[in-house]
């Protein structure tokens, strides 16, 4: 891979930190402001961002301190967790499109209690949204689909920066 085709450590780390932070802020915004309740898989898709954003910030700090190898390793970790996030997004989008079945925890709904006292108790429990129903779509893609695209792009950006950092380190 030519030197001109990969990102520098600071650029890759900033892209991952800023875009990752904006993505997780958007997820929280859809939940808290727009009122879209996340399903169990939606919540799991946030985990790579919770890990990836601090790792990207660490990569930036290591790079600025001249620790290129450490920054490269941190970016490899960012790429790995974002690739896992992309996989979760693809899996979730596939469930929404009916390509495969989701886990039983994602069935949504629930049973209606037959006992009147249990019915009153169940009123405060709330409904778990189904992973198979996209709560929002734009241009045909659900939030899970957009997460798959964003996480893939962040994984590629981090891998590009890691390649540049580690290739320079081994070449020099």
Could you describe each region identified by the protein language model?
Residues 56, 75-89, 106-114, 151, ...:
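Hydrophobic alpha-helical segments of small multi-pass membrane proteins
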Residues 36-50:
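Loop-to-helix transition at the N-terminal end of transmembrane alpha-helices
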Residues 1-8, 168-172:
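Membrane-interfacial, low-structure loops and terminal tails that flank and connect transmembrane helices
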Residues 125-172:
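A hydrophobic membrane-anchoring alpha-helix module
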Residues 22-31, 83-99, 117:
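C-terminal TM-helix exit segments that contain a strictly Trp-centered aromatic cap at the helix terminus
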Residues 58-66, 159-166:
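Structural signal for the C-terminal ends of transmembrane alpha-helices
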Residues 97-142:
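Extracytosolic (periplasmic/ER-lumenal) interhelical loops and adjacent juxtamembrane/interface segments
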Residues 6-18, 62-86, 156:
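Interfacial segments of alpha-helical transmembrane regions
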